[in-house]
Amino acid sequence: RTTQKVKVIEIIYVMDANSGTEKELWIKAGAIILEAVKFIERANIRIKLSVCMYFAKSGNEIAISTVKIKDFGDKLDLQKVCFPMAHPSMFRRIGFRWIETHPDIKEYGWSSGYGRSLSEDGKELTEYIKTPVHAYSISAHQIKKMDFDVIKVLNHFNCLKK
């Protein structure tokens, strides 16, 4: 009997944005991520899926909030993952509430706003948090720059055979 190594990928979807962002961006980008996850899992690659609903800076403080949506062994349950992956309220209401009530957020600038989106500044979440080698972060803005093309997203995750 030979044991097979199971391929795994961790995806962290960053859904922060500035106040002028249209809700359609999150809906379309979230749908593309879920389409990519379905494709990857059909290729027998296990996915850990997290959403980062806050990735911003104010003064010298950086706020990062992530929530695990699906673990490697979990089946993809669209009923469970659609809200956190594609609904604007996940970022706007739950993300804002997190920043408003987090006890370690001390910088005065947070009181007059919600900080500056780091993903819009072209920063990668993986620059700020420790992740395994097989982890990828992608933002709604990156997906928009990829023309909401699932093939380009899969290439970003190195999931297509060359």
PLM ranges: what are they?
Residues 2-12:
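Short coil-to-beta-strand
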Residues 6-7, 17-23, 27, 31-34, ...:
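Acidic, glycine-rich A-domain
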